Amino acid sequence: MSDGNVAWILASTALVMLMVPGVGFFYAGMVRRKNAVNMIALSFISLIITVLLWIFYGYSVSFGNDISGIIGGLNYALLSGVKGEDLLFMMYQMMFAAVTIAILTSAIAERAKVSSFILLSALWLTFVYAPFAHWLWGGGWLAKLGALDFAGGMVVHISSGFAALAVAMTIGKRAGFEEYSIEPHSIPLTLIGAALLWFGWFGFNGGSALAANDVAINAVVVTNTSAAVAGFVWMVIGWIKGKPGSLGIVSGAIAGLAAITPAAGFVDVKGAIVIGLVAGIVCYLAMDFRIKKKIDESLDAWAIHGIGGLWGSVAVGILANPEVNGYAGLLFGNPQLLVSQLIAVASTTAYAFLVTLILAKAVDAAVGLRVSSQEEYVGLDLSQHEEVAYT
């Protein structure tokens, strides 16, 4: 690997790491002030747990010697034999895992024990994230099938989005969720988080080329395009319904970013426009569906990341342009890629939801996911951290 490529992956690693607190700020602004510290703290806890587990065995079972296409071996446990460029790749992938677990915190907003989240996140990385990473990026069965996931539409967004839905269904609604509106306490904080996420996504998608080359350039351009288109769609919807709220605009942009993630290295700008346009619509409809069904996954990891990642992963099979990276989708004469993508999407969606549901119920039965009603009333900043966000 050239010095320029090394520098780009180092920079991309730092950009992706910045997305972890970005998720924390994005979520913290949308909860009540008594839970703001907790949401940001959970993002840092996600990073800490991921770093430790990734070094001990997470990287190895994700990218180690293939075992029947299902999981990697333990040959890289404690980073044994991982040196040089492989060490850089390990660190880059570590940040992806950390961001994914941070996204999952949407499901437990304002009502979960920190200790239970630590246990659940460790189990989830082991039994959901690591298998997905191996299946698609580590030479597993979906990679052998021909499925493509450039930067994590399935590994990151489908996994975290559908897992969040399962956890939210297990932990139950927040107190007062159906009695009164629970409003964001700081939209500016959410906007800061969105800015960090959009900025970091250039390393997330651009760095996934694993080189400073034309594919990386294309990835950055289409990432920006899809985000802008989807954000514009939500802005227009806001105007149709009344006023274009800033929270809706940035939520739309994040939906566009999630949707382009699996496709960033395979589609051109025209494809990115289509992906962003559809993502803006379907993710908004998913959010509207969630509200009507009174599902308290209220920071919308499922609607934005889960549905966005699902659509983007399917779109790869339709819109992949061989001029970008050599892979052709349905519109360029290769229907087989769409078949592979549909199998991969169905498999990862079902697995993420069902396995997470089992893990969440197991943790809830063993130690309890939820804080007491009194602790929830006081707020998790005080009850879980003995701190307050504002004085």
Swiss-Prot record:
Extracellular side: 1-7, 58-89, 138-152, 209-217, 264-268, 320-337
Record field: pH dependence: Transport is pH-dependent, with a steep decline at pH values about 5.0.
Keyword Transmembrane: yes
Cellular compartments per GO CC: plasma membrane
Segments on the Cytoplasmic face: 28-38, 107-113, 171-188, 238-245, 288-300, 364-391
Keyword vocabulary terms for this entry: Ammonia transport, Cell membrane, Membrane, Transmembrane, Transmembrane helix, Transport
Keyword Transmembrane helix assigned: yes
NCBIfam families linked to this entry: amt
Function: Involved in the uptake of ammonium/ammonia (NH(4)(+)/NH(3)). Transport is electrogenic. Transport the ammonium and methylammonium cation with high specificity.
Entry protein name: Ammonium transporter Amt1
Lineage: Archaea, Methanobacteriati, Methanobacteriota, Archaeoglobi, Archaeoglobales
